[in-house]
Amino acid sequence: RSPALTDFIFMVKEKSHMFITGPDVVKTVTNEEVGKEELGGAYTHSSKSGVTHFMCDNEEETLMSIRELLSFLPSNNMEDAPLVPCNDDIHRQVEALQTVIPEDPNMPYDIKDIIEPVLDNQYFFEVMPHFAKNVVVGFGRLGGRSVGIVANQPAWLAGVLDIDASDKAARFIRFCDCFNIPLITFEDVPGFLPGTIQEHNGIIRHGAKIVYAYAEATVPKVTLITRKAYGGAYIVMSSKPTGADVNLAYPQAEIAVMGAAGAVNILYRKSTPEEKQEIIKDYEDKFSNPYCAAERGLIDEVIMPRDTRYKLIQALEMCHNKNQSNPPKKHGNMPL
């Protein structure tokens, strides 16, 4: 039986190994010399292949991590997400969120500085923390109810989507949908990673997995756009057109086909630098803001960062009795 058929895989550093063929067979067939740790150890599978979800230092830590993971999950796929008593004020404001996002839209920040403070007791249980770091996934609680978190990470590759990030996010989204766990998406995405490596390895096919997973999911889906939401990557990250139930945005959110500078350089390539700067400012005022999108029904509410926790809980309450079903099929045709 393949371990990849299980929902989550835990490995212990320097003790756990898995591979299709061991080092001896690899050397015999390909003449490549490689140790079992490099070939299929915990670090390899948690950071390079993405096969394992958790890498632990010892067996005791592994067992504790398994217990922690199970606390977020229902007993089976017919039950709702677990609801536990919440001693954290649902109206709690987080003033620090007002200054987390830099004024310069090209400056990075850690999306976990937004995720963690808004969750119950500021606790976030991250899944696959060492693989495809440009996307963050994991579990938390809001108002006592388990939620699945999917977020772009501006601190790693500017938060772009690539092949590995697409696979990581899509698999997690589908797991949450299987076990009735609501999805919270924190979006700050400038686009898909460009280049021949991505194109030749099928970024179109892999990128389609995220949009398929979101569109297929019937659990409550709440999205918060923290800063950038550009082009096709915006559509992919649980947007209104793909079936998101509630879409929120911060005042500095930029929802557009592309950034102002990129758009102006294409549309006004013959203009002088001075003229371009003036046009960029006009473009940003007209299009690179959440209010234009809100007028078109793509954003439900523009919120202040300090109110994020309550607004997310409020949105989940609105969707709690959501009843949506897909057309009767044995299964969908996921783009694999």
Regions found by a protein language model. Name each.
Residues 1-336:
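Ligand-binding clefts of soluble mixed alpha/beta catalytic domains
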